Each structure stands twice: as C-alpha cells, then as structure tokens.
Amino acid sequence: LRLNNDGQPDPLSGKPYSSRFVTECITQGARRFGWSRRSHAPGSMTAPNGAQVGWGMALGNYPSPMSPAIATLRIGANGRTRITVSGHEMGQGIKTTIANTLLQGLDVDPNGLEVVIGDTSAAPQHQTGASCGTAGCVPATLKAVRRMQAALQELMDGRSVPGNIHRQLATIRRPYLQVEVSEVAPGQGAEAIEYLRVSGDGAAGPEYPEFTSMSWIAHFVEVRVEPTTRRIRMPRCVSVVDCGRVISPRTARSQVHGGVVWAFSAALREATEIDPRYGGYLNCDLAEYLIAVNADIGEIEVGFVYKPDPLANSAGLKSLGEVVMAGASAAIANAIFHATGKRLRSMPFRIEDLL
C-alpha cells in the first residue's frame, strides 16, 4: 500500500522535496526485518511460550530546518587545532560530528583538536531544538574546512612541504593560520547572520524558496503480548532513515536507538496524571511516571539510505533527532493490532486496554 501510493510533491506547498527516498527506506527495512514472512490475519502468529506475536510498520517524517552559523578555524604550528562553531550539545554527539567533518578534509593531529560549542563568547548560538543542530554546525564546519584548504594552498604558493599542516606551518615559520566563515540556509542572505548575533535565532525551513526539505523513516516492529498478564514487549525493531549524508554513523545510529526507546516508552508507558481539582501533576517522579526498561525492548537494528541531499545544504545532510519518534508509535500500534485484533488509538497503550 505504501509503495503504491508514494506521493512526491509537498501537499502543503506544492513544491518538490529536496530529496525523498521513502521507497528505499521501506524496501530496505522490509528486507532486514523479514516482512515477507508475515502472516496477514490478526492473531495468527504465536510464540512458543504462547505469547501473541504482532508485526507492524509505519512511516514517519519530520521537517529539516537549518540554522545560520559562524565557524572560526585556527590551525597552529604547535600541533593544536581549534574550531569554534555556532551550536551546542543536545545529546547527539555534535562534537564528534564536527571533528569527523574537519578531519575528513584536513590533515591535522586529532589529539590536538579542540571543538568549542555552546560558548557565546566564541560564536553566537542558535536555539536548542527543531533537529537543526547538525544541519547548522556541519555546513559551517565544512565551509571552514574548504576555506582553510584554499588559504593553505595560497600560503604554500606551489611549494611542496612534507608532513601534516602543523609541520608545514612550522617549516615555513608561520605560527598559525586562521579563517572565519558564516553559512546560511537556502534563500537566506547576510541578514540572517546579523539576526543570529542579536537574537540567537534565524532558522529557516522546512519550506525553502524552491523546495521543501524533510527527513523520512520507516519502522518495522515486532511485539509480543503475554497470554496471562497481557504485558507488551518489543523484542526487535528495524528502523531505516533517509536523513541525507550521514557524517558520523556511530553517533547517528545512537540517536536512532534513543529515539526508538523514546517512542516505545511514549506508546506504552508514559502519561502525566493531572489532579482534576487543582490542576497539579500527580506523578512527578520516576516512582509514579512509568518509563520503559531494558526488559521491555530487545534488538534495535538501524539502517540508513546514505544518499546526500545537495539541495538542503552544502553538506548534503538533513535532520535526524526527532524524525525517529515520528511513526514509531504508529508501528507499535499496528503490531499490537496484528497480534490481538484490537485497534488502540489512544496512547499510552496499557495492559487494561487489552483485557
């Protein structure tokens, strides 16, 4: 059904997507999961221990905005490299991603590399949110790398000096080389940088002048419903993402793992209880606010389409953090229906809903 109804233009703006590899997400996820072995009838799959087995899938998408950013890169003859970027750590391992981007383009000592983020005295900082951390930091970092390559080539003026950049600078008795760059989203001008300096904002997207930029994900999940307690567990999940170029596969995979756990917990555990008399929260600690635990979730397999999006930004990447949450809860609901024949439409899905 999904493969036969894959719409390409953005239904809201009518503009084409910058990239949309939903078909690849679905086919790769189905192959990894073994979707072809699925029995279609609800309640038709049973585990050896008597648990009802359900397989479900769903798609998710999320806007891919971009924040303007400033990056300053300094390489010294003393073996030190320092890059300051507009951006900060939101849990995705952004320092690792920035370092990977820099080290892929410049021959510098990684042991002497310092990545400075979240410091307004070094660079203006944008908002925390909207999955635009990497999409802001990395294009600016990549631009700084290319500017440094050009500056180094001009400085060397055709001379061939052995060794890495630190050794080359030391050989020609240059204490350091520094560049500063700024990067804006498609369709933005220099005023976006000034707005960033003043307000700490200035993000654009997902609708740009010529296109709309979105990230996409396909989730395939298996749930097992215990026959007596009706407790729901998820022994495995396969999630395949179209997020453009993947700069740091290890940290990107970790983001998807965390997002799937977040989605499972939201779908089956988490809910705030409000006092109807006074409006206060009744479950404001982890003793009362239920969350997922290790026993609830088994293997989480993550895949990427690995196709850069050259329209979205100079780095070819799109947002990743929050797209993982989109669609995962729906896939779990579909799997519960496949296991039990009950269509649950209000989260969290709890044991009492299956009694």
Q: Model-predicted segments: where are they?
A:
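A short, ordered amphipathic alpha-helix with a cationic face
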Residues: 88-90, 322-323
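Residue-level recognition of well-ordered beta-strand positions that form the cores
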Residues: 60, 74, 84-86, 224, ...
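A generic structural motif
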Residues: 87-89, 243-244
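Short acidic alpha-helix initiation/capping motifs at coil-to-helix transition points
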Residues: 92-95, 328
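Thiamine diphosphate
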Residues: 94-102
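Conserved beta-alpha junction segments in alpha/beta enzyme cores
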Residues: 54-80, 85, 92, 206
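C-terminal catalytic domains of large/alpha subunits in multi-subunit enzymes
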Residues: 1-51, 55, 101-355
